[in-house]
Amino acid sequence: MAKKSMIIKQQREPKFAVRAYTRCERCGRPHSVLRKFKLCRICFRELAYKGQIPGVKKASW
């Protein structure tokens, strides 16, 4: 779980555009965030396995 202070700090508009970064909307993790879903890889995997993300299914080949 991310620190609440860092989550609040990230929500503010940065002084410079390059300082902006993505965070998982579910847990607040700053790394490995899928932009399309706004979720980190861990949360994405959990929700995908439960079938809570529409249009996403486990790949098999």
From Swiss-Prot:
Cofactor(s) of this protein: Zn(2+)
Q: Which InterPro entries match?
A: Ribosomal_uS14, Ribosomal_uS14_bact, Ribosomal_uS14_CS, Ribosomal_uS14_sf
> What is the disulfide pattern of this chain?
none
Record bears the keyword Metal-binding = yes
Write down any Gene Ontology CC term. Answer: small ribosomal subunit
Single GO MF descriptor: zinc ion binding
Provide an example Pfam family for this protein. Ribosomal_S14
Quote the record's binding site residues for Zn(2+). Answer: C24, C27, C40, C43
| Source organism superkingdom | Bacteria
Keyword Translocase present in the record's keywords: the answer is: no
| Keyword line | Metal-binding, Ribonucleoprotein, Ribosomal protein, RNA-binding, rRNA-binding, Zinc
Cofactor: record remark: Binds 1 zinc ion per subunit.
Which processes are annotated in GO (biological process)? translation
Query: Per the similarity annotation, which family is this?
Result: Belongs to the universal ribosomal protein uS14 family. Zinc-binding uS14 subfamily.
PANTHER family membership: 30S RIBOSOMAL PROTEIN S14, SMALL RIBOSOMAL SUBUNIT PROTEIN US14B
Tell me, what does this protein do in biology? Binds 16S rRNA, required for the assembly of 30S particles and may also be responsible for determining the conformation of the 16S rRNA at the A site.
Q: How does it assemble?
A: Part of the 30S ribosomal subunit. Contacts proteins S3 and S10.
The name under which this protein is listed is Small ribosomal subunit protein uS14
